[in-house]
Amino acid sequence: MSTEKEKMIAGELYRSADETLSRDRLRARQLIHRYNHSLAEEHTLRQQILADLFGQVTEAYIEPTFRCDYGYNIFLGNNFFANFDCVMLDVCPIRIGDNCMLAPGVHIYTATHPIDPVARNSGAELGKPVTIGNNVWIGGRAVINPGVTIGDNVVVASGAVVTKDVPDNVVVGGNPARIIKKL
């Protein structure tokens, strides 16, 4: 039988009140608090906190404030930058390629809930992974919804709400996001 953590990461219905998951969220919040209250010149400390949070050494640059659920489901490529107020709800994996930039206030969600009200009211939750390719720029206050894959060389316009997969080499914008230009 799978643990609640295994079910969560696999995108199956799970119970977020599980003791292990509650402990993991608390750990992430403590690390994020330290990160968000560190000084800009404390580069080594910030990199160590991110390594502890993500479970991998990264040269990512993330402006405080940053928020996530667990951290261990976030996988960042080389040369990653996130500006102020980035949120990543990582109940399922979030994979971001090389040379990606997130403008202020970008939110990436893997967390979702059952559509059926009986299932939703039972406390069960689920998630869907998000994958973002290489050389992607996501504009300010854009939202990437659960289950979305964004291709390489994509620009997501400010304020876009991405609800469906995005192919390579395009600019998308709007709510819901649609292709507005091919690159």
Curated annotation (Swiss-Prot):
Gene3D superfamilies associated with the record: Hexapeptide repeat proteins
Keyword Cytoplasm appears in the UniProt entry: no
Major enzyme class: transferase
Molecular function as annotated in GO: identical protein binding; maltose O-acetyltransferase activity; O-acyltransferase activity
Catalytic machinery residues: H113
Role summary: Catalyzes the CoA-dependent transfer of an acetyl group to maltose and other sugars. Acetylates glucose exclusively at the C6 position and maltose at the C6 position of the non-reducing end glucosyl moiety. Is able to acetylate maltooligosaccharides.
Name under which the protein is recorded: Maltose O-acetyltransferase
Lineage of producing organism: Bacteria, Pseudomonadati, Pseudomonadota, Gammaproteobacteria, Enterobacterales
Gene (UniProt): maa
